């Protein structure tokens, strides 16, 4: 059975997801509690104001999500601890994802899936009022804030749907236009991505046609004007198109002209809200980099300093490491000593495999780990610059792509030699900068980068299945991905990096 029928309002969809309730015998769309909760424009505005935080916490804040497992699955980070499915997703050789509802780490996909749909539900509820219900949101001075509220709801709607498409193989497309009295069929990730981009297009159009500034607490630390919201939506659209391919063939088929159009109107600033350790925080960054937890995989270390091994061999590896670099040295990336910290010991358990071992950790954002109140990025301007370069690579405009790369972090922060205007050098440099300069920023970034380059270790799931517990609720057959489960090269990797 590949369909599910909802007879409920948007909020009921989330109630089913969150409670695991198999019964659909609940209140209908005329539910007076819902009508009361969204009867006032101020209530709807308040929900819209919380959407940035709700989405950010789904991709950065949650320890119970897929960010950490994708990080180690991409061999960007490494950790032998069983927490957050990090050990299970980084086994060598790789193993299939256990998608049973009884799996101890099932909460990682369950929380991610439910959380994104919960945020989507809130967006849809706002849009149902301001677009379908013709509710007008008016500020105290009489300013019409309906376009602002609508734009934010469309932005987060697109991001929420988009990350379902980036992470999972399929899901349910539910927007403010969905007739929830009818059957909602499951859709493949490509259709989800397409819908998400259309949502972002609506946000972009609203931002171009209107002028507004969000309240300070909607995105702490950033004055989010209509221009900046529009830039964020453009970058988000480029991200979804660029990062969604599951292999090289898919990547070649991307509409790179469209990616370039979005990126050229994308971020001129870093989207990095200031944390308060109460409503805004990033457990993803914390558990990836706090002392004793995750470390940088030796693949990353070797990329910056080729004298180091790309894989930890055995106990004797400590005795064969080269002297560490602490000043600029030709052929070695300066960021190995500005953004990473050498460690003389490794806390991981030997019996779980030396392949987990590393001698470096990521230290660039250590100020957050000591104060918990600094800005933490999800999307950065340099990420948008790389999207511009990638679009030019595929036009091809090799000189233009090389110019962007040589004016950017590779040279200015890494101290590396400029790249030549060749397709191979440019492609390698984009891949490199996403792994090094954007290390541990946006959740899943390194995984998506490795995935579309066919470089994830053989057997690594290329996407995750709808959680088993949700399949049970939907009366759908359980399935999963990994070695022998799914289609090689489409559902699990048949490539690799070593």
Residue ranges and their predicted role:
Residues 61-65, 434-451:
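Bilobed periplasmic-binding protein-like "clamshell/Venus-flytrap" ligand-binding domains
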Residues 38-45, 84-383, 394-400, 425, ...:
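Structured, solvent-exposed acidic/aromatic patches
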Residues 1-19:
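Sec-dependent bacterial lipoprotein signal peptides
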Residues 385, 398-412:
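Active/binding-pocket-proximal capping segment
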Residues 419-420, 428:
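C-terminal soluble interaction/assembly domains
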Residues 389:
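Active-site-proximal region of nucleotide-activated glycan assembly enzymes
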Residues 21-77, 416, 455-498:
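Membrane-proximal, proline-rich intrinsically disordered regions
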């Amino acid at each position: 059975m590949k369909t599910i029928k909802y007879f409920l309002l948007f909020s009921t969809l989330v109630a089913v997801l969150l409670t695991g309730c198999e019964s659909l015998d609940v209140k209908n769309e005329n539910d007076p509690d819902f009508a009361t909760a969204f009867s006032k424009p101020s209530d709807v505005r308040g929900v819209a104001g919380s959407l940035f935080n709700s989405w950010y916490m789904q991709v950065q804040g949650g320890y119970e999500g897929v960010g950490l497992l994708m990080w180690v699955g991409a061999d960007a980070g490494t950790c032998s601890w069983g927490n957050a499915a990090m050990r299970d997703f980084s086994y060598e050789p790789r193993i299939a994802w256990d998608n049973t509802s009884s799996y101890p780490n099932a909460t990682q996909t369950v929380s991610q899936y439910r959380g994104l749909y919960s945020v989507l539900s809130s967006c849809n509820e706002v849009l149902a009022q301001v677009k379908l219900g013709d509710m007008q949101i008016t500020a105290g001075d009489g300013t019409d804030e309906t376009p602002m509220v609508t734009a934010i709801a469309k932005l987060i709607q697109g991001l929420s749907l988009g990350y379902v498409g980036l992470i999972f193989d399929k899901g349910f497309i539910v927007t403010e236009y969905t007739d929830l009295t009818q059957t909602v069929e499951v859709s493949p990730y490509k259709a989800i991505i397409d819908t998400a981009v259309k949502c972002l297009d609506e946000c972009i159009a609203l931002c171009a046609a209107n002028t507004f500034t969000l309240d300070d607490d909607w995105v702490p630390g950033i004055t989010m004007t209509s221009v900046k919201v529009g830039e964020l939506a453009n970058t988000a659209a480029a991200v979804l198109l660029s990062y969604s391919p599951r292999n090289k063939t898919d990547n070649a088929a991307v509409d790179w002209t469209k990616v370039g159009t979005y990126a050229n109107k994308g971020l001129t600033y870093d989207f990095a809200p200031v944390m308060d350790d109460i409503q805004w925080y990033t457990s993803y960054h914390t558990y990836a980099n706090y002392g004793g937890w995750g470390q940088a995989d030796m693949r990353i270390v070797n990329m910056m300093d080729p004298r180091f091994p790309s894989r930890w061999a055995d106990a004797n590896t400590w005795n064969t490491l080269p002297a560490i670099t602490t000043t600029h040295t030709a052929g070695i990336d300066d960021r190995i000593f500005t953004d990473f910290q050498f460690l003389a010991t490794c806390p991981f358990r030997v019996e779980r495999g030396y392949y987990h071992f590393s001698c470096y950790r990521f230290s660039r954002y250590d100020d957050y780990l000591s104060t918990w109140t600094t800005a933490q990025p999800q999307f950065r301007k340099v990420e948008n610059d790389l999207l511009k370069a990638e679009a030019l690579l595929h036009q091809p405009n090799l000189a233009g792509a090389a110019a962007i790369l040589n004016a950017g972090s590779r040279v200015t922060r890494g101290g590396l030699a400029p790249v030549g205007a060749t397709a191979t050098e440019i492609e390698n440099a984009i891949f490199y900068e996403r792994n090094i300069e954007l290390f541990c920023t946006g959740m899943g970034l390194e995984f998506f980068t490795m995935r579309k380059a066919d470089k994830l270790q053989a057997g690594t799931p290329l996407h995750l299945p709808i959680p088993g517990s949700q399949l049970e609720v939907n009366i759908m057959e359980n399935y999963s991905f990994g070695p022998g489960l799914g289609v090689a090269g489409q559902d699990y990797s048949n490539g690799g990096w070593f």
